[in-house]
């Protein structure tokens, strides 16, 4: 487990240096390990350059997104492959991307639950999925299926317009009995996406998702939900409010999803309203930056040394140096908010907006896992006088999530190929000193 983000003081984080006050007997003890669990609709993003005649041939609508059946997807894929039209094949899926990035950042294990084609040919899209996935991701619990995993075709016309064709294949065929209870005992979080419980009637995926939530609650593992898209929320906002209230600890969303969920156009106000249902909110707001909202114990609150910020809640970041906690674990819970503007004003050229939110969430998950890891290995540390959700403060997690988002925006793939640099360039070094 790498230290989350950068800091001058690392509190004898039990990786490189051990606390010299801990007895030799305890040092000889085997270090406790942890991991993050995620359930995903396993799919591959396939990019290809095509002409308008190709789009018409397959009955697609230029510039729009359409769901296609498996037979049409197979014909389309084979034609693209035979004519060497495919420019990129990336492993995709919101949770797959998030777990991959977590494993790259933390240099530690994550566990993916989902489906995988039992018959994999070299060069096929299932093969590409495995090739593009971090070796620190445990894929041993994937459920084999006879058909294809999901495919999302991004067909790029000569004028640059993107047309999407989505084939779900067998990606929603994950069964409840394929969710192993034993992996939840030492997990730091269970990560889900809203898409999992919104499938066709008869698909087993929603039942499998609820089984995982049941195990997470049994072992006191925080359940994290990423909203996915505003269209999922718009269909039935009240359903999602109830779902968050009943099952979710942490929610990650963008400003559009926040508005669909709460009715508030301002991301800070949306995050504040979401605290009625969950304990911690991560809200990305594009060029405006990133907000966090949550609770902390009143007696453990820490005042910021940074300028107080105006907003729909006056001086909302007053206690952003506090650490997030589950509301029910606090004797006197108080709300805490934090905000950060895009790192370095954002990349000079944004190469890919797909996955920046997943990147921000992977940084938050790393910090949550680091807290679990530190608490298990240095239980008598002053860091654990209260039961906190993260290792770092609201402010520090914002900084870390923001930095990871920047890295994803500046590259083509939503999956990081390497962790953050050990040292920033001299001009950016001050970012971590704030």
What kind of feature is each model-predicted range?
Residues 56-82:
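Active-site gating loops and adjacent loop-to-helix segments of metal-dependent hydrolytic enzymes
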Residues 70-74, 212, 274, 405:
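Hydrophobic alpha-helical packing residues
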Residues 75-86, 106-113:
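Glycine-/proline-rich flexible loop or hinge segments
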Residues 89-111, 358-362:
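Active-site alpha-helical elements of protease catalytic centers
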Residues 351-354:
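Short, threonine-centered small-residue motifs that mark membrane-proximal processing/anchoring sites
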């Amino acid at each position: 487990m790498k230290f989350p983000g950068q800091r001058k003081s690392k509190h004898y984080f039990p990786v490189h240096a051990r606390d010299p006050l801990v007895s030799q007997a305890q040092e000889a003890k085997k270090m406790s390990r942890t991991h993050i669990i995620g359930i995903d609709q396993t799919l591959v993003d396939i990019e290809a350059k095509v002409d308008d005649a190709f789009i018409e041939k397959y009955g697609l609508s230029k510039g729009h997104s359409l769901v296609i059946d498996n037979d049409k997807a197979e014909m389309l894929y084979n034609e693209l492959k035979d004519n060497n039209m495919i420019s990129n094949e990336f492993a995709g899926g919101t949770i797959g991307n998030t777990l991959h990035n977590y494993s790259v950042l933390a240099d530690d294990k994550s566990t993916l639950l989902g489906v995988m084609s039992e018959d994999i040919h070299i060069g096929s899209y299932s093969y590409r999925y495995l090739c593009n996935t971090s070796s620190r991701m445990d894929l041993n619990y994937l459920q084999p299926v006879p058909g294809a995993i999901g495919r999302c075709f991004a067909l790029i016309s000569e004028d640059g317009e993107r047309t999407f064709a989505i084939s779900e294949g067998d990606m929603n065929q994950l069964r409840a009995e394929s969710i192993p209870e034993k992996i939840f005992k030492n997990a730091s979080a269970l990560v889900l996406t809203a898409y999992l419980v919104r499938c066709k009637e008869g698909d087993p995926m929603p039942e499998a998702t609820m089984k995982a939530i049941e195990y997470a609650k049994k072992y006191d593992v925080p359940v994290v939900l990423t909203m996915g898209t505003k269209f999922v929320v718009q269909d039935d906002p009240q359903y999602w409010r109830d779902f968050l209230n009943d099952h979710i600890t942490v929610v990650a969303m963008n400003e559009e999803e926040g508005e669909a969920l709460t009715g508030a156009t301002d991301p800070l106000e949306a995050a504040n309203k979401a605290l009625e249902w969950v304990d911690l909110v991560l809200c990305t707001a594009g060029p405006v930056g990133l907000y966090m909202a949550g609770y902390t114990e009143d007696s453990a609150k820490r005042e910021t040394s940074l300028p107080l910020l105006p907003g729909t809640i006056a001086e909302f970041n007053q206690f952003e140096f506090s650490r997030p906690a589950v509301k029910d674990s606090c004797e006197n819970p108080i709300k805490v908010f934090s905000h950060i503007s895009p790192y370095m004003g954002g990349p000079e050229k944004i190469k890919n907006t797909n996955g920046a939110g997943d990147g921000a969430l992977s940084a938050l998950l790393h910090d949550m896992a680091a807290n679990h890891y530190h608490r298990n290995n240095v239980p008598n540390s002053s860091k654990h006088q209260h039961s906190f959700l993260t290792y770092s403060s609201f402010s520090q997690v914002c900084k870390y999530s923001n930095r990871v988002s920047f890295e994803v925006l500046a590259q083509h793939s939503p999956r990081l190929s390497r962790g953050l640099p050990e040292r920033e360039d001299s001009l950016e070094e001050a970012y971590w000193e704030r």
